[in-house]
Each structure stands twice: as C-alpha cells, then as structure tokens.
C-alpha cells in the first residue's frame, strides 16, 4: 500500500485550515503532484491512502473538486476531535437559532445577518456553496469566527482581541467541547482537562509537537513494513515524518510549483537513504548539488507527476488561428522583446490571434496591459474603417486580437488548449503541466529550453532566442504537413506518459530499494 502525505499548508501556520471564501483568489494553484499521483492510482484501481496532518475541515469537498472523493484518508485532527467519516452535509443557516427580528441581507460575496442595531454575523461560502465561516461583529468589531467542517460539524472557534487581531482558537469535539486551546500569539497549545488522558503532555510549545505525537500513534497502527510513504517535500514536516518512518519506506516528492528551489534547510530535513522524486531539471540539479555537498547518495528519479490523456483540439475547425503564449517565469525585458516580435508577426494576417496565458493575473505588468489595449484598439479601428466589413459587424462581432486567459486551475489549461494551434513558452523552466497538456491536445510547442517532453522538429521547436520565433511559427503555421507530424508524434507520447507508465516508474524506484535489501 502506498500512503501520500501532502503539504496543503497555510503560509504562516502550516497546520491551520487553508479554506477561504470562494471570491478570494488563491496565490497559488491547488493542483499538485500529490493530487495527480493519487488520481493515477485511483484511475488504475490501485490501493493508496491519504494522510492529512493539518486542520482541514473542508477536505472532502476539496477532494471532490479533483475527482478524488473516493480516496481513503486518515486525518490527525479527526483523531483529535473525534470526527467520523461521512459525506459532506451543508449547513442550512435558516435552521439555526436567530432572533425573531433577524434580517438577512444577500450580497454577491456573503450573507449578512443583522441581529440588532450593533451586532451582525457574516456568513462566508466555499466555491461549492458550503458555509465555511460565521463571523460575529459587535459595533463593527470582529469578535469570533466559527469555522465549520463540510460534514456539518462546528470544528473550531477563533477569538479576536480589541484590535481585531486573532487571539486564540478552540478546537472542538463532535459534542461541541473544547479539546484544544491554541494561543495564536505565542503558539502554545493547552489540552482541556477532560481530554488530557489521551495525550502525553497537558501543554505543548506549538501545534507541530502535538501533531507529531498523534502522527506517531496513527502510523504505528496503520503503516506496515511493506508499505511505502510518498511525502510532498516541505521543510516544515519532513523531519517529523522521518522520525517515525524508516528511510527505505520513504520517498520525498519535489514539485516545482511548491519547491522553486531546494534550500539547505529543506535538504537537511530529508532523511538519509530516502528516495527522491523530482519533476524538473532545475530541482534535480539542486538536489545533486546538495548530495555532493553533504556526501549523500539518495536514489533519485525525474518523472512528470502529470499524466497525458488525449484531449480534443478544434483549432483546425476555426477561422482564426489562435497562438498561445505562456508569459509566467520571464523577465520584464525578455517578455517585452517577445511581445514586440509577436505583435509584429500577427499583424501579417487578420486571422491571427494571441492568447496570453498566466497563473498570476494581478502580476501582469502595466506596460503589457497598455500594449494589449493599444493593439486591440488599433485592430478594431482598422476593422471599422473597412466599409465592407463594418457594415456586416454587430458589437458582439468585435473581437480582440490579443486576449489574456488566467489559469486559476489546471482544467483552465486544458480548456485553453482546445482552440490553440500551437503554444509558446520561452521561460527558463517551461511549465510542466502546460507541456503535458499540449502533448495531450496534440499541438506543437515552441520552447526556449530543452526538456524531456519536447523533441525539436518532432512535437515542437527548441529555439535559443526570440529572434528565431518567426521561423518556428512559420514552420507550423505555413506547413500543414509539419503540424500533422507534430500531432502524430504527440499521440505516441501520450502512451509514453500515460498514468500506468508513471506508476511503473515509481514502483521500480520503490521496489529497487526493496530488492536491494
């Protein structure tokens, strides 16, 4: 049996709940190596289990979001709070005890429940429509936040001081008793007297100590000698996990969107002789450098944590030719140079369109926004000046020659690629999920760096500078034979990077160690 331990953590206190109201954009995408690898095991009917260390009251709806609802899991905080496994259950706020004269004020973002002239409660919802927080205000001052579990439990209450800062948090049992009191100022955790016999201490310096104690007890009952644990590498939990699981049973997964680089602290938190799984050339280089520095020889494998799965592409059915451009991971100077090239290129034909892809809409520089507006206005003015064209056009027909597509989740990538004729990624480390998705869609890729997933002149072009962009674009846009060859080559790669093959590579890494012992 394989066990997966993710790092779906808060940036400040890693054990705290990460759920936010649906309208708050996440700084990073949720989809990661753990979600993908578990999905592959589920798809292939292989046994696996999830172990969650942090407080995750909305775990079930989170798993459902990524088609992992059937995943078996163990939760440290479920053990602490005595919560049992059952299906999500939305809270009907109408059934709660409100004053007779309560007024419900509906807004696009929250529900405001006015209970008196000086008090009101705001109810916040997840993207699935579940109530996640009730926040009580007195004289416009936040007093308490009630944190709800997606199974219908009241999971915790956070209290705020007179300055509106979080003061302490109580974690509740299924019966509504306080089992843990966490001081949010100094981090200390106190176990309520009624439950102290379940713990080795009555007080802990921080929640991480208590979590490690409960984790140790959990794995002593669940994990056996032949089992293997795949851990999302994170310096905040690596050492605690390694303290209780033998190195031969451990693999650490390094994922570029989580581990941009490997620090000394993170590498030293990894137990000697554990396996290492990496998804990028840069992370592999970082780890090799650390291995040489500390004279270690951890077995390592570089694989994609994302599977290929053939997806539709309708670019040949469209009148316009859509060119996708990944703009993340580039310096301002390089991005400006590339955009100038591309703007000049699409001016050659009226049917060329640019779709700029980014995970970080708020980080798009002002000059680029102005460039997009200017090019679009110039194009529309040209269309309006053409009497024959403008006579046939309605306001709905006026389209933009350059558009921005924000990638909130990985399905946004798949959706964007449906209409693209090809995709460009000139960043120093081409986005892995974009490459795998382009293979799945069968479209050519133009990259500025050599990778395992793009073969020059086969399913794409590898160019050294943006000066070569025109030739690379012409190669696929002017010659259908070249595009068709890239499509056929991508179909072959779909088999190579299918989920069963990725799992086989993982098993070879794990079983190789077992054979050696």
UniProtKB/Swiss-Prot annotation:
Q: What happens when the gene is disrupted?
A: No effect on cell growth, significantly reduces export of the cell wall protein SraP. The small amount that is exported seems to be glycosylated normally.
Alphabetically sorted, this entry's keywords are: Protein transport, Translocation, Transport
Residue ranges that the Swiss-Prot or TrEMBL entry lists as coiled coil: none
Is Protein transport one of the keywords? yes
Family label: Belongs to the accessory Sec system protein Asp1 family.
Name of the protein in its database record: Accessory Sec system protein Asp1
Gene behind this chain? asp1
One BP term from GO: protein transport
The keyword Chaperone is annotated on this UniProt entry: no
Q: Which organism is it from?
A: Staphylococcus aureus (strain NCTC 8325 / PS 47)
């Amino acid at each position: 049996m394989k066990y997966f331990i993710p790092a779906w953590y808060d940036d400040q206190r890693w054990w705290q709940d990460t759920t936010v109201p649906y309208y708050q954009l996440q700084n990073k995408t949720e989809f990661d190596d753990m979600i993908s690898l578990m999905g592959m095991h589920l798809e292939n009917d292989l046994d696996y289990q999830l172990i969650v260390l942090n407080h995750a009251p909305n775990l079930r709806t989170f798993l459902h979001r990524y088609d992992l609802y059937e995943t078996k899991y163990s939760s440290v905080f479920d053990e602490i709070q005595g919560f049992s496994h059952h299906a999500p259950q939305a809270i009907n706020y109408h059934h709660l005890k409100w004053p007779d004269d309560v007024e419900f004020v509906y807004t696009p973002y929250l529900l405001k429940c006015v209970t008196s002239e000086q008090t009101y409660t705001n109810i916040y919802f997840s993207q699935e429509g579940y109530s996640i927080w009730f926040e009580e205000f007195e004289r416009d001052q936040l007093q308490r936040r009630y944190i709800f579990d997606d199974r219908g439990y009241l999971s915790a209450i956070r209290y705020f001081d007179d300055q509106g800062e979080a003061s302490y948090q109580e974690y509740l049992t299924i019966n509504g008793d306080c089992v843990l009191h966490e001081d949010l100022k100094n981090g200390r955790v106190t176990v309520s007297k009624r439950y102290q016999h379940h713990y080795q201490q009555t007080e802990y310096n921080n929640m991480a100590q208590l979590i490690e104690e409960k984790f140790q007890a959990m794995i002593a009952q669940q994990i056996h000698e032949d089992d293997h644990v795949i851990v999302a590498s994170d310096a905040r939990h690596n050492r605690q996990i390694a303290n209780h699981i033998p190195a031969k049973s451990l693999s650490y997964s390094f994922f570029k969107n989580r581990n941009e680089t490997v620090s000394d602290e993170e590498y030293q938190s990894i137990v000697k002789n554990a396996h290492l799984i990496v998804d990028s050339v840069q992370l592999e280089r970082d780890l090799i450098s650390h291995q040489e520095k500390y004279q270690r020889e951890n077995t390592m494998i570089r694989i994609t944590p994302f599977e290929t799965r053939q997806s539709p592409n309708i670019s040949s059915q469209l009148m316009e030719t859509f060119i996708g451009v990944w703009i993340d991971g580039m310096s301002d100077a390089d991005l400006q140079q590339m955009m100038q090239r591309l703007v000049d290129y699409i001016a050659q034909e009226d049917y060329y369109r640019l779709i700029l892809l980014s995970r970080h809409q708020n980080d798009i520089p002002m000059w680029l926004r102005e460039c997009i507006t200017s090019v679009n206005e110039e194009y529309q003015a040209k269309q309006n000046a053409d009497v024959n064209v403008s006579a046939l056009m309605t306001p709905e027909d006026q389209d933009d020659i350059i558009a921005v597509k924000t990638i909130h989740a990985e399905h946004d990538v798949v959706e964007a690629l449906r209409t693209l004729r090809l995709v460009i990624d000139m960043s120093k480390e081409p986005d892995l999920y974009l490459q795998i998705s382009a293979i799945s869609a069968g479209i050519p890729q133009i990259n500025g760096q050599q990778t395992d997933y793009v073969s020059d002149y086969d399913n794409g072009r590898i160019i050294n500078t943006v000066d070569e962009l025109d030739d690379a674009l012409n190669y696929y846009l002017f010659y259908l034979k070249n595009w068709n060859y890239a499509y056929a080559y991508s179909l072959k790669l779909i088999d190579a990077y299918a989920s069963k093959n990725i799992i086989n590579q993982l098993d070879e890494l794990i079983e190789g160690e077992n054979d050696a012992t």
